[in-house]
């Protein structure tokens, strides 16, 4: 496959990827038996880093792993991984692995500092018809194209919670970028999630797939992240449980994005904010998911309608980009620049 060759040509990129995907089978050399390794893989833990990212308590909940075994596994994993501290310079070198996926609009990319970032969760929220699903579909195509900074392009996993995924839309967008329809559709793995639990289970499959084809997958899209939680947990009585389950899922997403160096893009809905009328806010709506989702998302983008097919994206929260706005258009070929 073409992506393999591109990645293989860059020795620096390859070394970094190697150290990123230390296979869990390496534990055999440190006295962990194959049966126990299989148990870890069954819950989506496929790398040494994955063990480091999982608490002892969570590992003890894996069927067939006793506390003594978990201690032994943790000890073996710690021998294989370097200690946790780096200088800021070393970390900045490590950050060079981070890539950006273009949104299809130069203005929008500029707003995001290059596009949708890997090793991070980017959340786009807005009312209906603000371009969230169109952006998801456009990213399915642009993530496959070679991009800036030696980005080789790669495959995508799309988890659909609202039945809004349309392969025909990808064909239209592929035409704009002059890419073969079948090749584009072949590189997108699609799954429909029916409940919030099912959504969580799919993430185990995602982790296994990312590990199996290390370095090939570049993007995970969930459209939309909160829809099923809204249905499965209704009313204030279930809010605490909903937020707890949501926190677990977002933590899993963060780990997947860092462990496999992929970009995670999620869309979110809006809700009326009953407290906003007291403070005379111009727009008394807010994204759902509360503080838990707000803290888990690395970059949050607010989308709103402009004139006609124009939409306005605003940085709502970002660790490095200033609060700013960009105007983009929804075209037949997906997200594009607004024509004056």
Swiss-Prot record:
Single GO MF annotation: ATP-dependent DNA damage sensor activity
InterPro entries linked to this entry: AAA+_ATPase, Dmc1, DNA_recomb/repair_Rad51_C, DNA_recomb/repair_RecA-like, DNA_repair_Rad51/TF_NusA_a-hlx, P-loop_NTPase, RecA_ATP-bd, RecA_monomer-monomer_interface
Name of the molecule in the record: Meiotic recombination protein DMC1/LIM15 homolog
Family: Belongs to the RecA family. DMC1 subfamily.
Taxonomic classification: Eukaryota, Metazoa, Chordata, Craniata, Vertebrata
CDD domains: DMC1
Compartments where located: Nucleus; Chromosome
NCBIfam families: PRK04301.1 (NF003301), recomb_DMC1 (TIGR02238)
Alphabetical UniProt keywords: ATP-binding, Cell cycle, Chromosome, DNA-binding, Meiosis, Nucleotide-binding, Nucleus
Location, primary (coarse class): nucleus
Keyword Magnesium attributed: no
Top-level taxon: Eukaryota
Subunit note: Double stacked ring-shaped homooctamer. Interacts with BRCA2. Interacts with the MND1-PSMC3IP heterodimer. Interacts with RAD51AP1; the interaction is direct and stimulates DMC1-mediated homologous recombination.
């Amino acid at each position: 496959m073409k992506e393999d060759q591109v990645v293989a040509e860059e020795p620096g990129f390859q070394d970094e990827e190697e150290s990123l995907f230390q296979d869990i089978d390496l534990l055999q050399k440190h006295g962990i038996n194959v049966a126990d390794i299989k148990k870890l893989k069954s819950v989506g833990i496929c790398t040494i880093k994955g063990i480091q990212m999982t608490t002892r308590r969570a590992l003890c909940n894996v069927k067939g792993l006793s506390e003594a075994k978990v201690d032994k596994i943790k000890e073996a994993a710690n021998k294989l991984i370097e200690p946790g501290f780096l200088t800021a310079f070393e970390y900045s070198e490590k950050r060079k692995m981070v890539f950006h996926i273009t949104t299809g609009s130069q203005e929008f990319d500029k707003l995001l500092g290059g596009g949708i970032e890997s090793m991070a969760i980017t959340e786009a929220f807005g009312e209906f018809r603000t371009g969230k699903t169109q952006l998801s579909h456009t990213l399915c195509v642009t993530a496959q194209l070679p991009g800036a900074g030696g980005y080789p392009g790669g495959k995508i996993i799309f988890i659909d919670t609202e039945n809004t995924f349309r392969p025909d839309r990808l064909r239209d967008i592929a035409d704009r970028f002059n890419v073969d329809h079948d090749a584009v559709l072949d590189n997108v793995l699609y799954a429909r999630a029916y409940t919030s639990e099912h959504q969580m289970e799919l993430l185990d499959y995602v982790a296994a797939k990312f590990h199996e084809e290390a370095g090939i997958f570049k993007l995970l899209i969930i459209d939309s992240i909160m829809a099923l939680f809204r249905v499965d947990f209704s009313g204030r009585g279930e809010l605490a449980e909903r937020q707890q389950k949501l926190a677990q899922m977002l933590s899993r997403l963060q780990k997947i994005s860092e462990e496999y160096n992929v970009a995670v893009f999620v869309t979110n809905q809006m809700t009326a904010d009953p407290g906003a009328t007291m403070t005379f806010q111009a727009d008394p709506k807010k994204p759902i998911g509360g503080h838990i989702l707000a803290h888990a998302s690395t970059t949050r983008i607010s989308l709103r309608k402009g004139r006609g097919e124009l939409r306005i994206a605003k940085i709502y929260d970002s660790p490095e980009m200033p609060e700013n706005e960009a105007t983009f258009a929804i075209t037949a070929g997906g997200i594009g620049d607004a024509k004056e």
